[in-house]
Each structure stands twice: as structure tokens, then as C-alpha cells.
Amino acid sequence: MHDLGKNGNKRDANRENILKIAREIFSKYGFKKTTLDDIANAVRKGKSSLYYYFNSKEDLFQAVIMKEVEILAHELEIVINRNTDPVDKLRDYILTKLATFRNLANFYHAIENDITAVGFIDDVKVKYEQDEIRMIKRILIEGVRKNEFEIYDFNLAAIGITTAIKGLEMPLTAGYYGDVNLERSVDIILKIICYGIMKR
């Protein structure tokens, strides 16, 4: 039993190492240009060793994407569970989302580009968007309970804010504004979300 446990741990460690290196290579060359040979060479194993853990390049890429989704979800859940006021929580949520997204190249490109060769991407997008709406909704409900927000339709408001954040992902992480101060940019956007553009 002890040996089985050790073997299981070694197998998990090998799988995690392959995932780590595959993330780097996929992010550098993209899904279409990356081959299993590229990854096997980087891991310093034969291609047949990769098949012990993953059935195909698509299977490995799916595992990479799910790992990055897991990283993002974990970071956002930490923000959601913090004991901070709703406005600060919304700010931290947007900031964490964009800052983490900058480091998740594979998930970012999978969301932005139509990777038709990988059928699971659409399912990931839908679940990811649903999770985002759910988390934003939690912040909004908390804000109304604490008498800081006035919202009449939580679902519609959450969809609107989620869509606004999604629109910022590309320009603030990789586009024209990719090098600007993220905190300052988020503060400007949050001011518009919370107070609108009307002169007061």
C-alpha cells in the first residue's frame, strides 16, 4: 500500500510537471503550432510517456486550460470571501481578474480566439461566464444588504458588469493599454460603473 501511494504521488508530480511545461509552450507557440514532440523534448521524455498521462494534444491542452481556469477561480474566490466593503470587493475582483488574466496566456487566447479544433472550449467559455455572473451577483447582493448599492435587477446588473470587464480584458492585458498602471485604470472604470458619467 505504501509503494502504491508513493507511485501515485510520483505519477501526480510527473503529470503536474508536464502541465507546467506544456502551459509555457502552448502560451509561446499557440495550440495549432505546438506539437507533442515539442512538449516531450522540453519535458525530456519520449512522446510515448506523454500518452501515459494524456490521450492526445487536445487532451493535454484541455488539461492546461482547466488548470488555468482553476487558478483564476481560486484567486477570485479569495477576493469574494474577504471581509471588505462591497465597493472595495468589486474593485479587488476586477483588479485580480485582470492581473491574473495577464499571466494565463492559454486561457486568454482560448477565450479570445476561435479554436475550432478543440470542441471543449465553448463549454469552458459558457461555464466561465456563468461563474463570473454568479460571483459578481454575490458582491451586488452584499452591497444592497449593506445599503451601499441600489439595484433592481441583480442578474441584469451582474451581466452588464461582467460584459464590461470582459471588454477590458484584451486592451488592459495585451492591447494598447497593456502596459498602463492596472490599478489606476480599474479605479477609473469602477468610478464609471458606480457613479456613471453624469456630472454631479
Residue ranges with predicted function:
Residues 1-13:
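N-terminal intrinsically disordered/low-complexity leader segments
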Residues 1-2, 99, 134-146, 163-164, ...:
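C-terminal peripheral helix-coil segments that are non-catalytic and often amphipathic
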Residues 11, 19, 61, 65, ...:
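Amphipathic, non-transmembrane alpha-helical scaffold segments
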Residues 14, 57, 68-72, 93-97, ...:
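Hydrophobic/aromatic residues within well-ordered alpha-helical segments
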Residues 17, 21, 25-59, 63:
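Helix-turn-helix
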Residues 63, 67, 74-103, 157-161:
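Hydrophobic alpha-helical connector segments
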Residues 87-91, 126-129, 144-162, 180-184:
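All-alpha amphipathic helical-bundle segments outside canonical DNA-binding/catalytic cores
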Residues 98-138, 145-146:
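Short secondary-structure transition hinges
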